[in-house]
Amino acid sequence: LNGEDDSDVLENVSTNSNSDNDIYIIKIEGPFVNSKTNPIKYVSRFHKYRYYVYFNRQLKQSELKSLKWAVSFDDNDSTSSFFLFSSGTLENGAVRVEIKISEGINSFRIYSYLGGVPNNKIYTEAFFKKTVALFIGGAGDKEAYAGTGPTNIIQLEVQNPFDSIITIQPQEQLNLNDYKSLYLGYNEAYKNKIASNIISELNKIAEPKGLSINIIGHSLGGWNGAHLSQILTRSKYKIEILITLDPVGTKEGVTLVSDIYRPYPYSIYKYWINIQSSPTQYEADDYIAWLGGQWEPDKEKPNNYIIVDYHHREASKMFTEKIAGNFDSSDILLAHIQSYLNAKI
């Protein structure tokens, strides 16, 4: 996003507006990853990006030291900007710089100027990449189901402990402003409820292009969560990781009394972990899961598929079960979140 109307905002370094030597800034472009192909809108806090400023004529080497750069954060304009540095590198009639911005909450503006202060209408704007974790509970989790609950299992035993891990990460590895988690009932991840319960919340955070989605679902929440991965992908969101904890929903009876999809899920994901509960001795919750129909996906499709001797209700134990060397689902989820936020593009 550049200045609104170049003719209204041309910045002149000379006091003589009629002089042939007058030089002024026409526009600023960026950020670019490397070359001047297409600027990107969403950036990582952990990388430098290229910016270019263009003038009405070739900038002389002697004038380069007069060129300054500044930044303002979020909704602040140039009056609240901070000076960054002077100069840059001459390149094909423009001046190139590389800047890393790590402060701010959601966005920042880069200014280039020749006068004493930045011009409020000559800037380019960028936004920080964001990531969201959707924790989706099963029957009776977020609200009562058939006279039982709510148990809040996925929130108390999975979401809250994971969010606590997020909060202790070093700032140079993960900025808390870039992560958000949402607690959902399985029925909130169903058909037209997705727009009001999920899409509306995601729209408050970032556009699909600047957002990665992580889905963690238990029981019916795993079944609907797997469907959700396909639905959100169709809406241009990126599904970074899908974690299904003993997903349930294959039997016809449960589809008649629950807001779940009848067809088997066609999941779309970058990485999928499926954990199936198979206790040696069944308890009440295991019989309920059996009646609902435990989903056993094709074992070749998930990146990790393990069977554990935990009861269906023990989502926390499933989530922290070692599945890849010394790593559990929580570790892998954290790694994917950090990898996305740390990637340059």
Label each region the model flagged:
Residues 131-133, 137, 196-291:
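Serine-dependent carboxylesterase/thioesterase catalytic core
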Residues 128-211:
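Active-site catalytic motif of lipid deacylating hydrolases and related acyltransferases
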Residues 47-51:
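Structural beta-strand segments of beta-rich domains
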Residues 11-44, 56-58:
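Short, compositionally biased P/S/T/A/G/V-rich stretches that sit at domain boundaries
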Residues 92-104:
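Short, hydrophobic beta-strand segments
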Residues 117-128:
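Edge beta-strands of extracellular beta-sandwich domains
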Residues 262-263, 267-345:
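C-terminal catalytic-base region of ester-bond hydrolases, centering on the histidine
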Residues 103-116:
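Short, aromatic- and glycine-rich surface loops/edge beta-strands on solvent-exposed regions
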